[in-house]
């Protein structure tokens, strides 16, 4: 507990004194932070007061549900409970037939997802690999989400590459769940949307996608 507290205190100190830079223009969320108590340093870094961070953490949800397409496979996230899921985004795979490494393709994503569906000790399926045979971002995101839905009824995890993808993918989830607005009620997928770039900077384009995901009702992990 002592070490955890040291790390926590260090993070609060850095956010308040060093702050976060921005690659590009200030995204809407950053502007709201400035309106709610954050300040800009002389070097245009966003300084976030300790009290503001602590206030937000105090309001953060401690328990929630990761919904599955099959509701019996939904899982409750809460203190004291441990669940395991996939992660990453492999771009190469060892071909079963040729025994050689090659780039991952959409059918690999589907096959691996089907395997994950059968493994009892994996509780959710975040996109384990990237379909390298699809180049265009929105097309990749749509097909990735479809392959995951087709391969498992466990809770899903995705990463989206554009604002357009957010709308397209959530609309597809709506259809799978029975109609408009159903995904917002029981979101069967969460999203991992990193918005930070070393060293301690927000990337405008990633922030905008993250904000669009929040507005669309996609839970963030």
Residue ranges and their predicted role:
Residues 103-221:
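Helix-rich catalytic cores of soluble enzyme domains
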Residues 1-107:
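Acidic/polar, glycine-rich intrinsically disordered N-terminal extensions of enzymes
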């Amino acid at each position: 507990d002592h070490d955890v507290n040291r790390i926590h205190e260090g993070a609060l100190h850095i956010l308040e004194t060093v702050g976060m830079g921005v690659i590009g223009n200030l995204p809407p969320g950053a502007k709201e932070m400035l309106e709610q108590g954050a300040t800009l340093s002389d070097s245009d870094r966003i300084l976030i007061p300790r009290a503001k961070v602590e206030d937000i953490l105090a309001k953060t949800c401690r328990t929630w549900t990761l919904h599955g397409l099959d509701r019996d496979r939904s899982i409750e996230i809460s203190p004291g409970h441990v669940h395991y899921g996939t992660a990453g985004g492999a771009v190469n795979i060892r071909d079963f037939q040729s025994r050689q490494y090659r780039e991952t393709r959409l059918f690999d994503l589907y096959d691996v997802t089907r395997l994950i569906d059968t493994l009892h000790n994996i509780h959710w399926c975040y996109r384990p690999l990237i379909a390298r045979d699809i180049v265009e971002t929105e097309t990749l995101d749509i097909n990735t989400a479809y392959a995951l839905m087709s391969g498992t009824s466990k809770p899903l995890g995705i990463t989206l590459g554009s604002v357009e993808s957010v709308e397209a993918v959530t609309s597809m989830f709506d259809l799978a769940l029975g109609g408009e607005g159903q995904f917002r009620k029981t979101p069967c997928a969460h999203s991992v949307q990193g918005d930070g770039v070393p060293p301690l900077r927000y990337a405008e384009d990633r922030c905008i996608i993250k904000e669009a995901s929040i507005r669309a009702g996609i839970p963030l992990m």
